[in-house]
């Protein structure tokens, strides 16, 4: 009976690059038998550190925080770390366990980590807080990754494999560039930031059913159906790579707008309190707080895909064709305007106040609207993807691969500043609308303003990989280059 290794096509993904030193990275494994059960246990441990090599850029720090930028919703990382400081000092481990009985087996993978810099050290602007965060975004923790059963079989002489459980499935030929064919699994972004990270640490397995089957000696088919949806885990707010500060779970008090002057906010609240329109200042004096509403996660059902692969002997090349329907793993920032009744109260108060102090009326209306609006994170559903790929080896031994992907309805994030200022559209002071042109988007009282538009996106990319043996005392040097082109249509 001919079988194939069910783990032979592990995903390739972009690695975050930073100045990092891996101080130790021992790896070891053991094999064992329990009667007729074959087992293996592999482990990898590492200790590493990363440093900031540039001073904070004032243009990326909001004016309310002493910089020159227009927003303070994405500057915490610049305020927390100075040039020369470590932003990560981490110990981590990852372990694989496989148990196999004949052609059937189970595979488990888990990891743990502890970042001493983020967990134990004090930060200059905002301390790193793990409260309410996703486990994978925390400064320390442990997580079960893969957990699936598999069975290898053959129909005649044609091998096949089936898997069920939490797993990673990789399609396409991308190595570094994202948003290509490989979109089945979400990403643990934080894991890729850590020094000494491995690809298997940063891919988030999800529950799915997966089947692969050879149809001929040269043609094979694959398919999957996901049983659950999961999201990409982004950097915790305030960490070195965090961008922006308002998306990660638990980072609910970081979206602050308008004035950060305490006296001005107190004056505005004195005016607004009588009408029940008080606003909340940011805990870090960054401005007036815009509340975060509940996330709107995608549904679990409706995610599936199919692939065909053909190996052309005469060309020594494998070709692939793919179709996938999936829900976004990436967060979209969206807004919800103040309710119609709240806007009516704001406009009534501002109109009466304008007879006494027009400037204060406009400020009060803007503050009350912002402080009584909210934002939310959502994940658009039913994204369709079509793809083609090839992979070959050139006569000089260089591996050459490439792919093209097409999404007719990919969600593209709108400018978040436009989303926020669109919430001021309904402000009306004595019939005048002072913020009518504050945004290119149109906001309405109490209505959702979805922060994306569906666009056609086509992406081409190609990769070259060459191995050089026995270089400068190393057994092998790997040189990888990748180039891509992305077109956003109407």
PLM region descriptions:
Residues 32-73, 106, 110:
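Transmembrane beta-strand segments of Gram-negative outer membrane beta-barrel proteins
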Residues 37, 73-77, 87-93, 140-145, ...:
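Residues that define the transmembrane beta-barrel architecture of outer-membrane proteins
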Residues 39-47, 104-110, 160-162, 221-223, ...:
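Transmembrane beta-strands of outer-membrane beta-barrel proteins
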Residues 43, 93-99, 108, 146-151, ...:
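Residues on the lipid-exposed face of transmembrane beta-strands in outer-membrane beta-barrel proteins
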Residues 47-53, 103, 112-116, 166-170, ...:
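Transmembrane beta-strands of outer-membrane beta-barrel pores
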Residues 59-78, 119-133, 185-194, 237-290, ...:
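Solvent-exposed loop segments that connect transmembrane elements
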Residues 100-256:
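Outer membrane beta-barrel
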Residues 101-104, 154-158, 204, 216-218, ...:
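Outer-membrane beta-barrel channels and translocator barrels
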């Amino acid at each position: 009976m001919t079988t194939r290794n069910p783990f032979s096509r592990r995903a390739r993904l972009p690695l975050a690059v930073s100045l990092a030193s891996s101080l130790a990275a021992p790896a070891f494994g053991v094999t064992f038998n329990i009667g007729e059960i074959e087992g293996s246990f592999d482990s990898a441990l590492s200790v590493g550190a990363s440093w900031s090599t540039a001073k904070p850029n004032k243009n990326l720090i909001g004016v309310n925080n002493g910089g020159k930028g227009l927003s303070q919703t994405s500057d915490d990382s610049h305020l927390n770390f100075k040039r020369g400081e470590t932003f990560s000092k981490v110990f981590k481990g990852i372990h694989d366990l496989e148990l196999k009985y004949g052609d059937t087996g189970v595979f488990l993978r888990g990891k743990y980590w502890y970042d001493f810099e983020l967990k134990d050290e004090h930060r200059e602007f905002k301390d790193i807080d793990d409260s309410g965060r996703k486990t994978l975004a925390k400064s320390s923790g442990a997580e079960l990754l893969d957990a699936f059963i598999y069975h290898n079989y053959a129909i005649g002489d044609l091998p096949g494999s089936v898997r069920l459980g939490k797993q990673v499935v990789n399609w396409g030929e991308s190595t570094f560039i994202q948003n290509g064919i490989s979109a089945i699994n979400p990403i643990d972004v934080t894991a890729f930031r850590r020094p000494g990270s491995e690809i298997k640490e940063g891919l988030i397995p999800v529950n799915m059913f997966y089947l692969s089957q050879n149809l001929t000696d040269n043609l094979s088919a694959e398919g999957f159906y996901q049983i659950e949806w999961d999201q990409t885990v982004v950097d915790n707010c305030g960490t070195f790579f965090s961008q922006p500060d308002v998306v990660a779970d638990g980072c609910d008090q970081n979206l602050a707008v308008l004035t950060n002057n305490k006296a001005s906010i107190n004056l505005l609240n004195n005016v607004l309190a009588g009408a029940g329109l008080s606003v909340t200042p940011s805990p870090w004096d960054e401005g007036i707080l815009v509340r975060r509403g509940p996330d709107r996660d995608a549904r679990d059902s409706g995610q599936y895909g199919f692939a065909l692969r053909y190996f052309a002997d005469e060309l020594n090349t494998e070709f692939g064709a793919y179709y996938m329907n999936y829900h976004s793993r990436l967060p979209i920032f969206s807004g919800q305007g103040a309710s119609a009744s709240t806007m009516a109260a704001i406009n009534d108060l501002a109109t009466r106040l304008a007879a006494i102090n027009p400037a204060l009326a406009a400020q009060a209306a803007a503050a009350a609207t912002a402080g009584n609006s909210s934002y939310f994170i959502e994940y658009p559903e039913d994204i369709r993807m079509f793809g083609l790929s090839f992979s070959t080896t050139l006569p000089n031994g260089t591996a050459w691969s490439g792919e093209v992907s097409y999404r007719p309805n990919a969600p593209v994030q709108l400018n978040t500043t436009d989303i926020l200022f669109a919430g001021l559209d309904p402000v009306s002071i004595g019939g005048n609308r002072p913020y009518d042109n504050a945004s290119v988007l149109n906001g309405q009282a109490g209505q959702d303003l979805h922060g994306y538009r569906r666009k056609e996106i086509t992406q081409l990319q190609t990769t070259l990989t060459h191995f050089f043996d026995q270089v400068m005392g190393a057994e092998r040097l790997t040189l990888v280059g990748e180039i891509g082109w992305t077109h956003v249509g109407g």
